[in-house]
Amino acid sequence: MKTKLTFLLSFTFLFLFYGSVYGEEPVVKKEYWDNGKLKSETPYNGLGTSWWETGEKKSKIPYINGKKDGLGTSWFKSGEKMFTTHYKNDKEEGLDTGWYKSGEKWGEMDFKNGKDDGVQKEWYPSGRKKSFRHYKNGIENGIRKEWDEDGTLRYEGNFVDGVEEIK
């Protein structure tokens, strides 16, 4: 009986100890700039944040099980939104969008499993089209068009597996 009780207590202690040591999530990883200011805080689960060396917020990215997962946002030092990036399992996934400091949309890029996949669009600060490119699995495939700032089409080509077709 005493042996059974000792065994059960030992087993219980071992189980509790193992769970408390190995069951906890890692602490938040912190990095600092040379000037001593906080550069980034990256949790195993939760919202990671980074700052510019001057202290302004630089980015916020959600983490699940130590991997980027969800909608991340980045800002210019002046506070204007720079990018929104969708992540899934530590890779870009879905539509990412970028802006000029002035607030006008700079571009949109589709991603699948961390690679360009879909139409990549860019605009001038005026809002006029700058370029449209098509990608499949990270490689340019399809029509590419580029415009001058006045709206004049200056280039049109077709790409297959990253190589321009010569007509």
Feature-to-residue mapping (PLM):
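Glycine/tyrosine- and acidic-biased, solvent-exposed loop/turn segments at the edges of beta-strands
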Residues: 2-5, 15-167
